[in-house]
Amino acid sequence: MYGYGYRYNSGLVVGAGGGGGDSYLVDDYAPYIAYDLRKISSTATNSIRVRRLSDNNELDIGFSGDALDESALTTFCSGTDGFVTTFYDQSGNSLDAVMATASSQPRICLNGVIDSVNGKPAILGDGVNDSLRKTGLTGSRPNTQIVLYDKIGTSGYFGAFVFNNITCFSLGATGSRIYQNGAAFGPYSTLNTQALLMFKSTELTTSDWKFYENGSEITNSGEAIGTFTYNNISLFDRPTNASRCNMYMQSYIMFNSDESTTNRLAIQDNINAYYTIY
């Protein structure tokens, strides 16, 4: 049991639902966007769509229980590489992140072996030309973004964008930091390994944002984040085909809200309990 009265099992939040019984993270917290390589919604049927290199055929990959269906993925990609064409949105808003250009699709299998971090499947962006994107969005502050990643490279941007008026994550030599409205905010997070990052923005005042790494707040430098809007999500680069990220990604979740402390802790613990990050 956790201190918040919940017990976590995969994407389930047990006893957290208003009517009692088992429910999923998305069912209880209603994010705007929810990409994850596990089942986090009771209505989700697929996590990713994969193209195999050998013949360019594609297949939707769903779940085995609440985990990614690794058997279906390895069977489909037996002896060849697999690339993600679609990261399905489990929020119910149908905001799937896609990449139609074969050479720009991030990898999920190498010669039939699933790419993984800490024993769980992970999507690999090569830092050269890979991306997954969703355009045509409408969003502004307040906002909460959560990402589970494992960085390899030391530069690049990913997150929510509208040209340079952005609120995104910026990779650095050590960890990552927030980049907003053309300015880099300090300080960096500390880890170059698998990490769960959360960025929350609230009102238009100084110190109106918070940044967390593996459940602990990183004290910011007091910058006022200012007004922002976004109209697209780009998971491994800027939407201008620049600033690519060499990293693994397992989850990206966004709320058009400033999630409460109670929700933040519950969501972080849910993700950590499945992926065993810290």
What positions do the PLM features span?
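Extracellular glycan-interaction patches encoded by glycine-rich segments
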Residues: 185, 221, 227-250, 254, ...
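Short, flexible beta-strand-to-coil junctions
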Residues: 1, 9, 39-45, 49-58, ...
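Repetitive beta-architecture junctions, highlighting loop-to-beta-strand starts
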Residues: 46, 176, 207-209, 247-250
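Short, surface-exposed linear segments at secondary-structure transitions and domain or protein termini
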Residues: 66-78, 176-179, 227-233
